[in-house]
Structure formats: C-alpha cells, structure tokens
C-alpha cells in the first residue's frame, strides 16, 4: 500500500535535479521522537516494504536517508533505529529493527514498544499483537499512535539542505494550506513539533526553517510560485520570525 508520496516542491526539485535538497518519499519516513517537552530522544528511519524487500540490502535511497540521520545522530548524541515493516500485508504482527544500521532482528510489536521504552519514551499499555495497514495510515503509524501514548512529540523531516560536501545545514518543515502567502503564520498548536525539530538542529549545528506555499483543494492546486520562509530559533523572542518570500527559482538556488 502506498501513502503520501510527493508534492509540487518535491517534483520541482526532482525535475530540475537540484543537488542540495534531499528528502524521502513514498513509504519512507525520517522521524524524530521526543518527550512532552519536545526534547529529542530518538531518531528513526522507518520504511514500509514488500515481501522481496523485507530482508534485502539497503537501497541507494535508504543509504542516503540513513546517512543524513546518522550525521545528526552522531552530532546530537541521539540513538538511531532503522525499522522495516511489511506494507503489502493487510496487518502486521512484527517488524525488523536495527540498532546499529547493520544487523536486523525480528521483533513483535510488543517488543518494539519495549525498545522505545528503553530510550525513555512513554509507552501505553495498549495491546500490541497486530496493526492494520489501511488507506489513510500505515500499520507502523497506527502502532505509534496507539502505543506511544500522549506524552511524546514526534515529527518527520520534510526537507534537508546540504552543502557541497553533502553535510546537512538546514532542515525545512513544509507547510501548505489555503491561506494566502501574506496571511499565513505558523499555528501555535504546531509549536511543540517545531521546537522538537529545532532542538535536534540546535544540537547538530544546523538551522531550522519553515517553508510555506499555498495549496487549494477545489480546484486542487499546489502553488509553489512563491514560498514564504520563516526562521525558527527558540533561544530568541519571538522564536519564529518571518524571513523572506522566494520565487520558486530563487528557492531552488537558495
């Protein structure tokens, strides 16, 4: 089963072959887990695969995605897990987990909860025998919502900017809605997630920015002709400040 795979900005990066922007799509996620105070505790590269990929070597896409997470893992002193789950099944009872980026072990979903608990993440007592892959969410994400409880913050990494040596320098959170470029501001209810990503960037000597573009539903149009940039720094007041509005060409060259 395939989930959210792309957006207009990703498609432009691909079509223009922009080398300094990196991202994962399809059934792959680069995740940051933290406590209720938005303190990062764990990094995860999670991927839904089919039967033939389940025990296969890392793909080139995997290697690049894990490489970026490994960099911030090293510089932030945060552990990194790699998790594979079957996305071609209606339900899953196990996953593959690697805690060293090399060797996978099969674990039940109850054991997966224990692994997360080992890294000081709160785990609920919800039964964890099996979880469904459905049209709106993967079995892994359904497990996450059910078993990690409300005392966590979690965010996926939308977009990286790397330098000429491939070292990550900026993480972007991509936001889209029907609000005009001039009107939109980050919503207060998202601040905990913003703080989580910023904290990871701060530990890793990177910048964190929010990139916003207008997207309408009726008719559907993902308008990336203009992209509004906000800088995020929770050591300052205000912690989120409007920076500039780029044309798509300027953003590609940013």
Name each model-derived stretch.
Residues 70-96, 198-227:
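Nucleic-acid nuclease catalytic cores
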Residues 54-59, 145-147, 154-156, 217-218:
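Intrinsically disordered, charged low-complexity linkers and terminal tails
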Residues 11-14, 18-21, 25-65, 157-161, ...:
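Conserved catalytic cores of phosphodiester-cleaving nucleases, focusing on short active-site segments
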Residues 1-36, 73-78, 85-155, 203:
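Acidic-basic catalytic patches of nuclease active cores, encompassing PD-(D/E)XK
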Residues 100-110, 221-246:
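Short, electropositive alpha-helical surface patch
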Residues 106, 165, 183-185:
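An interfacial alpha-helical scaffold signature
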Residues 244-254:
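Charged phosphate-binding loop/patch that engages nucleotide di/tri-phosphates or the phosphate backbone
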Residues 54-83, 183-203:
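Short, charged, amphipathic alpha-helix that recurs within catalytic cores of restriction-modification
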């Amino acid at each position: 089963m395939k989930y959210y795979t792309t957006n207009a900005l990703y498609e432009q990066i691909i079509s223009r072959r922009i080398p300094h922007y990196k991202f994962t799509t399809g059934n792959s996620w680069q995740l940051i887990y933290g406590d209720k105070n938005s303190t990062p505790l764990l990094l995860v590269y999670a991927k839904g695969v089919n039967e033939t990929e389940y025990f296969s070597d890392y793909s080139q896409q995997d290697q690049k995605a894990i490489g970026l997470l490994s960099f911030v893992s090293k510089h932030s002193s945060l552990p990194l897990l790699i998790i594979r789950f079957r996305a071609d099944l209606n339900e899953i009872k196990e996953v593959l987990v690697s805690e060293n980026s090399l060797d996978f072990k099969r674990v039940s979903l109850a054991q997966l909860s224990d692994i997360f608990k080992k890294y000081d993440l709160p785990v609920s007592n919800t039964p964890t025998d099996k979880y469904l892959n459905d049209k709106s969410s993967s079995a892994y994400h359904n497990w996450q919502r059910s078993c990690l409880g409300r005392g966590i913050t979690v965010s996926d990494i939308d977009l990286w900017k790397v330098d000429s040596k491939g070292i990550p320098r900026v993480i972007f959170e991509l936001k889209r809605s029907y609000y005009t470029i001039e009107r939109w501001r980050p919503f207060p209810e998202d601040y905990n997630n913003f703080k989580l990503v910023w904290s990871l960037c701060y530990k890793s000597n990177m910048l964190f920015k929010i990139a916003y573009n207008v997207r309408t539903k009726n008719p559907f149009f993902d308008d990336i002709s203009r992209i509004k940039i906000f800088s995020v720094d929770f050591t300052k007041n205000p912690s989120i400040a409007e920076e500039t509005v780029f044309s798509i060409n300027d953003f590609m060259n940013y």
